[in-house]
């Protein structure tokens, strides 16, 4: 008996049609939407030998949201060269700030990707660019901020502040101070991959004994070499660190979920608790809390801060904007929302924090910046 394949063929054609329409319509929608004009200056002051730039995720989002420079030029990331290029020599990526920051809506202080102990070597060989923000840079940033330019700073950018004078200039803009400490969840404190040799040496030098820790914990390191370990089951009930938005932060961002965070974060001290939009939740025991007090470490770990006093600024204390692959889907309308929905809230998922935290947070920041009209003389 001859089999009839017509129903199967029709079903396959119907599926292909639905898929094609589902991809083509959002692409046409993206192509037809009017671009958003924003001039964004990305300041990359990391050492030239640092890992790939952390602003790749920002550039993907700018492209996906169809945000372009006011000249009409779009932001383009060249993945092959691992650097950011803009068309026709109109680059807004800079290591040296101009004498006057004009025609700018947003200054973005970028930090480079790092999976190890946060450290930036600010010493350079003769003839090389000086890594780190100088007093000159800080003065120009503060001058621009006083004229209404918003400032966004990423995790680890404070390690690029080369002097106390730089800190003094940027402190009123960001509305926070650095404690000098950084923290990270460690799943195996005996692992030489997760706990570097430098951390072990610093601990042994100060404590006068071999590295004694095992199991899970939270590692805290100071820029001067100090090391504190919060042991899972003793200093913290569980070693997990969860990012949780405050009530103000939930209203601001629309994010209701909590997310387990496993990368490095800055421990900062805000001028006002009202500036905290999200914080890291830890299950500190009384013993762990006392250990932090003895070390002079704040027990509250802010994650995202927004300063809207005399200056408009935002600080992300974690590396949320890291993007592993620069996706083609940036030209699909709504792809950012789809990825936020379909990406599981699991720490093992690559780019989870990018889609579920960084993208919605940066979209809200860009929306606020867009609402502010700058008229330059």
Regions found by a protein language model. Give the residues of each.
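Extracellular ligand-binding/catalytic regions of CAZymes and related secreted enzymes
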Residues: 3-75, 250-264, 268-377
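Generic extreme N-terminal start-of-chain segments
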Residues: 19-50, 54-76, 90-93, 179-240, ...
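Loop/turn elements at helix/coil->beta-strand transitions in domains of secreted/extracellular proteins
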Residues: 38-40, 102-106, 146-152, 311
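Signal peptide-directed secreted proteins
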Residues: 82, 86-96, 100, 195-292, ...
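Post-signal peptide N-terminal segment of secreted/secretory-pathway proteins
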Residues: 67-142
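A glycine-rich, often tryptophan-bearing local segment used as a flexible ligand/cofactor-contacting loop or short
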Residues: 120-128, 132-248, 252-253
């Amino acid at each position: 008996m001859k089999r009839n394949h017509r129903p199967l063929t029709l079903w396959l054609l119907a599926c292909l049609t639905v898929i094609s329409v589902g991809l083509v319509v959002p692409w046409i929608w993206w192509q037809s939407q009017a671009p958003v004009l924003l001039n964004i200056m990305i300041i990359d002051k990391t050492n030239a030998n640092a890992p790939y730039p952390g602003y790749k995720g920002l550039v993907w989002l700018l492209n996906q949201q169809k945000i372009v420079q006011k000249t009409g030029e779009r932001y383009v990331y060249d993945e092959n060269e691992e650097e950011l290029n803009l068309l026709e020599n109109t680059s807004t990526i800079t290591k040296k700030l101009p004498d006057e920051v004009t025609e700018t809506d947003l200054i973005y202080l970028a930090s480079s990707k790092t999976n190890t102990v946060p450290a930036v070597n600010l010493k350079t060989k003769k003839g090389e660019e000086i890594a780190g923000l100088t007093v000159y840079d800080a003065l120009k940033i503060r001058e621009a901020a006083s004229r209404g330019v918003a400032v966004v700073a990423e995790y680890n950018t404070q390690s690029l502040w080369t002097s106390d004078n730089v800190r003094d200039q940027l402190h009123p803009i960001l509305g926070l101070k650095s404690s000098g400490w950084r923290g990270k969840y460690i799943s195996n404190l005996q692992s030489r991959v997760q706990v570097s040799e430098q951390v072990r040496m610093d601990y042994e030098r100060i404590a006068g004994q071999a590295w004694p820790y095992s199991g899970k914990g939270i590692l805290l390191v100071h820029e001067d070499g100090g090391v504190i370990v919060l042991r899972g089951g003793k200093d913290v009930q569980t070693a997990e660190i969860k990012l949780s938005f405050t009530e103000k932060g939930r209203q601001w961002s629309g994010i209701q979920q909590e997310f387990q965070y496993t990368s490095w974060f800055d421990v900062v001290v805000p001028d006002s608790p009202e500036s905290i939009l999200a914080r890291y939740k830890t299950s500190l025991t009384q013993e762990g809390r006392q250990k932090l007090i003895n070390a002079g470490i704040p027990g509250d770990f802010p994650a995202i801060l927004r300063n809207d006093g005399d200056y408009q600024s935002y600080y992300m204390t974690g590396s949320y904007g890291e993007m592993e692959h620069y996706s083609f889907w940036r030209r699909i309308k709504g792809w950012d929302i789809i990825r936020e929905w379909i990406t599981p809230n699991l720490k093992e998922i690559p780019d989870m924090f990018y889609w579920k935290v960084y993208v919605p947070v940066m979209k809200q920041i860009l929306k606020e910046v867009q609402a502010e009209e700058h008229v330059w003389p």
